[in-house]
A protein has these predicted regions:
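N-terminal cap/lid segment of alpha/beta-hydrolase-fold proteins
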Residues: 1-27
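Active-site glycine-rich loops that stabilize anionic/oxyanionic intermediates
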Residues: 37-41
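Conserved alpha/beta-hydrolase
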Residues: 48-76
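Residue in the alpha/beta-hydrolase core beta-strand immediately N-terminal to the catalytic nucleophile
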Residues: 64, 111, 135-137
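Alpha/beta-hydrolase active-site loop
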Residues: 82-102
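Alpha/beta-hydrolase fold nucleophile elbow
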Residues: 104-116
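Glycine-rich nucleophile elbow surrounding the catalytic serine of serine-hydrolase chemistry
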Residues: 114-124
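Alpha/beta-hydrolase-fold enzymes
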Residues: 122-174
Length: 174
């Protein structure tokens, strides 16, 4: 049997509440797996996997990143993290959930799984906060030619400058 727990915590953006979920197995927990989801996803998309792993004694947990799933703020802007230093804020939200889990379930091996956009967040996370993690799964990741990345970043900056930080970018998506 696996028990689903939903809860909220304060985002590091200082304004928003983050929706998080734990799928907690009955009995002894052998491992905690934190899922860091991809672009245009939400953590409950991983529920079938979480239920399966829960039956094997693995607690699965994760949060909806800012602008995703049930963590979409009052502005209703899907996919928009925040205005100030979004990459750092999202990584710090992932870290906050890890700390909460380790405080509530101390001494249990901890693994983090990053999929797609979540793989980039996870790699950034591991660079900043890798201690206390016994394993990492990076899947659906990728790399692009430097010139293409620079071009996309330039387009994003121009759109942000003229259209505002919360504007939905045209031509830059999945």
């Amino acid at each position: 049997m696996v028990r689903k727990e939903e809860f909220l915590f304060d985002s590091r953006d200082g304004k928003s509440r983050i929706h998080a979920v734990r799928w907690v197995p009955e009995g002894k927990i052998c491992c905690i797996l934190q899922v860091v989801h991809g672009m245009a996803e939400f953590v409950e998309r991983y529920e079938p996997m979480a239920m399966y792993l829960g039956e094997k004694g693995i607690m699965v947990t994760g949060e909806d990143h800012l602008g995703h799933g049930k963590s979409v703020g009052e502005n209703g802007k899907y996919g928009f993290f925040c205005e100030q230093d979004p990459a750092t804020v999202v990584v710090r939200d992932v870290h906050r959930l890890k700390k909460m889990n380790q405080e509530e379930y101390p001494g249990i091996p901890y693994v983090i799984l990053g999929h797609s956009m979540g793989s980039f967040i996870t790699r950034n996370y591991l660079f900043r906060y890798g201690t206390g993690i016994q394993g990492a799964i990076i899947c659906g990741t990728g790399s692009q030619p430097k010139a293409l990345v620079k071009l996309c970043l330039m387009i994003e900056r121009v759109q942000r400058l003229f259209l505002g930080a919360g504007h939905v970018a045209k031509g830059i998506d999945k």
